[in-house]
């Protein structure tokens, strides 16, 4: 049987960045790793309505910097920044060190695998027909500029007695091409019939310049945001 490697994991350091950026010695490494997992789980659960795509954790010296990528930054920040300040205090209490929280806006949520997966899972929980939910998500992604997308659902689809797997694809999704910018996410939909697994692969084009190009594009987008605020 052919087995698939994680599309993001195999591209780390080539066209993808790590979600945790820090160094720790052998004694403290496991504690830092467990803390990262707990904080991510806590933030995804607390900010469920804010369409959070990615949580990046950095540990410079004796503090922690957390970057939250969200399609709805207003919900995270709150009125006059009250919500984000409360969130910062709660996370700092959990981690036991000073915490800085940065908010990053996801400009095209239809090209983000996590957000597309959450959207499809939400529709399944509201009893929307699974084929309609898949097709709508695929069409929106292609309209937003995706070169290819694949969505796969597994479970008791439509309330069927026997679980099965259905998938829908449009365009191309080259999993073997390492320079291909492929975003991947796996989400669960908790329906009345049981859990349905939702997997999303989105091909957003090829990155020919490697990590240098990725970092340059990130700098440009941050610069544009600062100019916009000014």
Curated annotation (Swiss-Prot):
* One BP annotation, GO: translation
Organism superkingdom:
Bacteria
Q: Does the keyword RNA-binding apply?
A: yes
Answer whether the UniProt record assigns the keyword Ribonucleoprotein to this protein: yes
Domain KH type-2 as annotated: residue spans = 39-107
User: Which GO terms fall under molecular function for this chain's record?
Assistant: mRNA binding; rRNA binding; structural constituent of ribosome
- Pfam families (UniProt xref): KH_2, Ribosomal_S3_C
Q: Which UniProt keywords apply?
A: Ribonucleoprotein, Ribosomal protein, RNA-binding, rRNA-binding
- GO cellular component labels: cytosolic small ribosomal subunit
Q: What does this protein do?
A: Binds the lower part of the 30S subunit head. Binds mRNA in the 70S ribosome, positioning it for translation.
Its quaternary organisation is: Part of the 30S ribosomal subunit. Forms a tight complex with proteins S10 and S14.
Which family is this protein grouped under? Belongs to the universal ribosomal protein uS3 family.
Name this protein carries in UniProt = Small ribosomal subunit protein uS3
Native organism: Alcanivorax borkumensis (strain ATCC 700651 / DSM 11573 / NCIMB 13689 / SK2)
